[in-house]
């Protein structure tokens, strides 16, 4: 076989596979679950990623496709892969408050605790109390810190999510942890002009970072 013909023959499987993967991503984004499942049955790698590093599991979460997510879980798709933004599928589900997806992922073995922004922090940031409660029941570290030392309680306090603040305090979140800037949840609540949360934190023993030693 001539070199050019040989090279073309070697490339054919790669080109075909790339086309099949594109079909899979397109079917998922279009919500065409039967087509996506058919492609999985043809052997599409369940751990395929798009150009941004999003896995099929992440895309199923983003597109609210629980049926396809279940198919991917049955095929043991990897759950703790991070995309280019450093997010996992569970983080994305928690950020959007998609409790059924959060439950499916955790029950399938997705990591609840991780370095940096945790799924709990994501859920607290956006005020998704049911997701916060579920993650706490499943072992989420309540006082886990982001890279700058901020906690889920701080995010909920800053953004005015009283129900989440209540859940976290009931679960014994520490209101006096200070981040790298020396600020506590009380300081963050004040910045957000959330007077009801300021009162609740004070009732729980919360103080300003001026009185609380920075947490190490």
Which residues make up each language-model segment?
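Ankyrin repeat boundary/linker residues
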Residues: 50, 83, 113-116, 146, ...
């Amino acid at each position: 076989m001539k070199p050019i013909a040989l090279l073309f023959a070697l490339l054919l499987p790669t080109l075909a596979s790339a086309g099949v993967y594109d079909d899979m991503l397109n079917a998922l984004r279009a919500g065409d679950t039967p087509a996506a499942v058919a492609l999985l049955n043809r052997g599409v790698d369940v751990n395929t990623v798009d150009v941004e590093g999003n896995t099929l599991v992440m895309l199923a979460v983003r597109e609210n496709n629980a049926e396809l997510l279940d198919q991917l879980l049955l095929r043991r798709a990897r759950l703790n892969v991070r995309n280019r933004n450093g997010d996992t599928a569970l983080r994305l589900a928690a950020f959007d408050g998609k409790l059924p997806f959060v439950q499916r992922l955790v029950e399938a073995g997705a990591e609840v605790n991780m370095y940096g922004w945790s799924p709990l922090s994501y859920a607290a940031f956006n005020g998704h109390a049911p997701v916060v409660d579920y993650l706490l029941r499943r072992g989420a570290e309540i006082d886990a810190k982001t890279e700058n030392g901020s906690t889920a309680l701080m995010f909920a306090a800053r953004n005015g999510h009283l129900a989440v603040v209540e859940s976290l305090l009931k679960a014994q979140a520490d209101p006096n942890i200070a981040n790298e800037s020396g600020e506590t949840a009380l300081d963050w609540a004040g910045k957000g002009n959330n007077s009801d949360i300021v009162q609740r934190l004070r009732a729980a023993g919360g103080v300003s970072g001026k009185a609380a030693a920075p947490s190490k």
